[in-house]
């Protein structure tokens, strides 16, 4: 590539650098993009670059594939209801071991390898996330019944003071989705939904959900059915038609929740696309699916 072409590419990003300068962007990082080494490098480099051009990324990570593998090694079968992991006490210990003990530190190390400053946190740090036990309902024979998810929580309150301090000091916060209830009990939080809550509390400009799919599609086996832009009413219609199911449901709940709390747009991108985060922020067309209120 000629030097002038490289310069033109950099200049193309200038309006977006100006627009998002000093803004917070919440990155929810999950899926198989977290276990692909090349994809992990792309994401880390993207986040460090964002920080150095004056944009403030905040990371909330999942770890579903690694948690599943750890459970299976210990003779436990992962169980999900509407995309939420059923969590008994032993499963919660495994979740914390994988999220806080392994994945969080791996992300921090990767960011620092590429020149960033990063601090690993969980929702337990500095009373960051207060949570309560989640009540889940299912429809059975036209009846609404309550199902017990175990030690699964939903966010009641996000105290942003610790994150604000870290962002001001030029650190990239990396947050594991474990919350604490008012009795001091740990609760497993769905990372997508927690990311939406934190994005809203932080007044983030964008929520970017880095996963292992290209975005929201009518048919997951047909890339041509990818939606580039969706509104909340359109998404609700897709759920009613059964086009959005399983693990995508919590992601959509997170999208709607974040938009309701003032986030301007939510983007679902494939972390296996090289530099998907930079492409989403700094190019006209972006990648993946953008979700807005209307």
Curated annotation (Swiss-Prot):
Question: CDD domains recorded for this chain?
Answer: AAK_NAGK-C (cd04250)
Superkingdom, natural source:
Archaea
Binding residues for substrate, per the UniProt record? Answer: 63-64, 85, 188
Reactions catalysed, as given in the entry: N-acetyl-L-glutamate + ATP = N-acetyl-L-glutamyl 5-phosphate + ADP
Where found, per UniProt? Cytoplasm
Site residues, Transition state stabilizer: 28, 251
The record's annotation in SUPFAM superfamilies points to: Carbamate kinase-like
Q: Does the keyword Transmembrane helix apply?
A: no
Similarity section? Belongs to the acetylglutamate kinase family. ArgB subfamily.
Family matches, as PANTHER family: N-ACETYLGLUTAMATE SYNTHASE (PTHR23342), N-ACETYLGLUTAMATE SYNTHASE, MITOCHONDRIAL (PTHR23342:SF0)
Q: What is this protein called?
A: Acetylglutamate kinase
Q: Which gene encodes it?
A: argB
